[in-house]
Amino acid sequence: MIASVLPTYTRAPLAFVRGEGSWLWTADGSRYLDLGAGIAVNALGHAAPDLVATLTEQAGKLWHVSNLYRIPEQERLADMLVAKTFADTVFFTNSGTEACELAVKMVRKHFYDKGQPERTEILTFSGAFHGRSSAAIAAAGTEKMVKGFGPLLPGFVHLPWGDLDAVKAAVTETTAAILIEPIQGEGGIRPAPEGFLRALREICDETGTLLVFDEVQCGVARTGKLFAHEWAGVTPDVMMVAKGIGGGFPLGAVLATEDAASGMIAGTHGSTYGGNPLGCAIGAKMIEIVTAPGFLDEVSRKAGFLRQWLEGLVAAHPDIFEEVRGQGLMLGLRLKLPPGDVVKAAYAQNLLTVPAADNVLRLLPALTISEDDMAEAVRRLDAAAASLETQPA
């Protein structure tokens, strides 16, 4: 008999009833140190007091009214994002997948309205993850995600990760956009190669192609910048955002330049819940907090310590760990054994981590994690690795 919850996840036998900061509790009082943060969602930790206060205050005023009317909370958050990024305009969604759907529509409509309807192709990269909708799985093209789901949305060209020559060869008169994660998350915490994003920007400028960044996982202060592409010194035409922007509340967005968004006039897109007052009030508080003086510097400072300690783990357990990857507090440990084995060994140490492709263990702690909690997490990873080393082959 099928479970009442559709079994599309292989869930761990854990259920949590309370969270605070970087810690989660089960009903029996067991306490777990969380290095996953809901897969980079709980950016300020669990039950962050500022977000709880904002949610409580807004919940007592207004939750939902529909985009048929102006929504002051939505306008405030949009103004904040426009002021702090490349963007001229923002559309709010409830998730990263929804943001991907709009980004695809936006770039294609842009060229249709410019009198170039043949420009529909979008170049993407191996190892990508852009969500689970039909368009998003077509964009990524990963076999395990597309198998069995019938005809996919056409118009995506899949290229080897980081292969600039392949990009140059693939851009044609039918190319609309290049879509890339500045740091692949699900793909194994793989930052774009040095200079790659800048080279893509130059190709797009030369060919009139739009550059789309998926910052759903790597954005919103995760790397020590507000958005990860800032490290490369380039800007996109369109950007997808979600996860951390809501701090745990379902919220996403598409940011765009005026030119890139020029085709999206009234009636071309919509969302019943997207941009609701409750979500946008929380999003505005998130942006206020992570852009406050010193916050991003503190993320980078703590990330430096954590990376150094993880490098020590690699040296101490060469049969388990191969290398440290990533930037800021978006880190990964490439493993010499299946990630699931290490995840389970970490469970035994009451430590939560997240597996990824390319044999990688993701470490995505709350941006507010303390040094003591980071040190404790490394101690527990050390114990997990030691337990695996003592297991019979």
Swiss-Prot record:
Binds 1 pyridoxal phosphate per subunit. One of its GO terms (cellular component) is cytoplasm. It catalyses: N(2)-acetyl-L-ornithine + 2-oxoglutarate = N-acetyl-L-glutamate 5-semialdehyde + L-glutamate. The lineage of its organism: Bacteria, Pseudomonadati, Pseudomonadota, Alphaproteobacteria, Rhodobacterales. Keywords: Amino-acid biosynthesis, Aminotransferase, Arginine biosynthesis, Cytoplasm, Pyridoxal phosphate, Transferase. Belongs to the class-III pyridoxal-phosphate-dependent aminotransferase family. ArgD subfamily. Its cofactor is pyridoxal 5'-phosphate. N(2)-acetyl-L-ornithine binds at residues 132, 271. This is Acetylornithine aminotransferase. It comes from Rhodobacter capsulatus (strain ATCC BAA-309 / NBRC 16581 / SB1003). Pyridoxal 5'-phosphate binds at residues 96-97, 129, 214-217, 272.
